[in-house]
Amino acid sequence: PMTPEARTIWYKILVGKVPLRHFLRQIGRSTSSLCHLCTTSFEDTLHFLVGCPTKNDVWTSVLGYFFPHLHFSIDCLYTIMTTLTWPSTIWNPSHLLVVIGTTLRCIWNGHWQSSIHNVPFHRQLLVKRAIRGTLHILTPLPLDD
């Protein structure tokens, strides 16, 4: 199970329709092709999703919470998101997809709140939201008697 919003975001990734800064610049919605958060790197899809150090901190924290004995490199995360293939060390892929989908949604929302409304990209708040949202999806509801 994944939220409809997370599915929509993931669909945009899979079909190559992520609204990157260089595209937004071409249509007059941005003045720069640099990443809005780190302001030092050109924003391509890899950087937008996982390569930005600010966003990567969120990924590292959330994935470390749910998979403390595994390491996910930037390339590994990018491959999972763009091809829906995961490492053989993952024994429950649906669990991983929920974690990634929920975290992706939180980072996506944080990115656009920051970019459009000048709301600070608060990493720790996004980590908490991603963990809480993932646990909400993965924790079964108690059965009524």
What are these model-predicted stretches?
Residues 1-145:
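Family-specific functional microsites
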